[in-house]
Regions:
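Carboxylate-rich, polar loop motifs that coordinate divalent cations or form catalytic acidic clusters
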Residues: 1-192
Length: 192
């Protein structure tokens, strides 16, 4: 992370490592800093930095660490994923729509049916829009000004045939898509 810490999580435990002057790592647990929260099978499986806070995600809770304190919240609808595009923090609920975070609450932005009942695997910046990679739609969708449209690429047929697992954007604006059974693909902003 930007602060030089290595954030980690596991079953009902999360925190960070810092480098010591002796070239070792020292662990600092954050679990006991969560006030008024009862852990219940919370396994941390995703960690992201959002608007200056570190967010630890379990299958039923989110933990927000601002550098001084930790707040834990149970979510009614379980988040499938978390991703940030610009200053906006998104999550898709399991079997639900795509939501935007407003404070500590998720507000539905796009209903699941717009994605063909598919999972949104990633959200990436694309000029003034959000480029979303979906599992069942065979590739990418663009969200701009309240509308969703297909982003056509030269790999659409491949993405329909093979299970897509992940996508990232490189520093030079190349979209890299990983599949489970057919390797990785790199696309430019024109979908080539």
């Amino acid at each position: 992370s930007e602060d030089g810490r290595i954030y980690v999580g596991s079953y009902e435990e999360f925190g960070y490592f810092v480098h010591t002057p002796y070239n070792t790592l020292e662990y600092h647990s954050l679990k006991d800093e969560v006030k008024d929260f009862t852990f219940h099978n919370d396994e941390i499986w995703n960690i992201v930095c959002v608007q200056g806070e570190i967010v630890f995600q379990s299958f039923g809770s989110l933990f927000f660490y601002n550098g001084n304190s930790v707040e834990g919240i149970r979510v009614k609808s379980l988040p499938l994923n978390l991703f940030q595009v610009g200053n906006t923090f998104y999550s898709q609920r399991i079997n639900g729509g795509l939501c935007v975070f407003s404070g500590r609450k998720m507000e539905e932005l796009i209903p699941r049916k717009v994605f063909g009942n598919s999972d949104v695997l990633a959200g990436l910046p694309y000029d003034d829009a959000v480029l979303m990679l979906t599992r069942n739609q065979g590739g990418f969708l663009l969200y701009r000004d309240g509308r969703v449209e297909k982003w056509k690429t030269e790999c659409d047929d491949i993405f329909r045939k093979h299970t897509i697992n992940r996508a990232v954007i490189t520093k030079d604006s190349c979209y890299v898509v990983g599949t489970i059974s057919d390797g990785i693909y790199a696309l430019d902003k024109k979908g080539k």
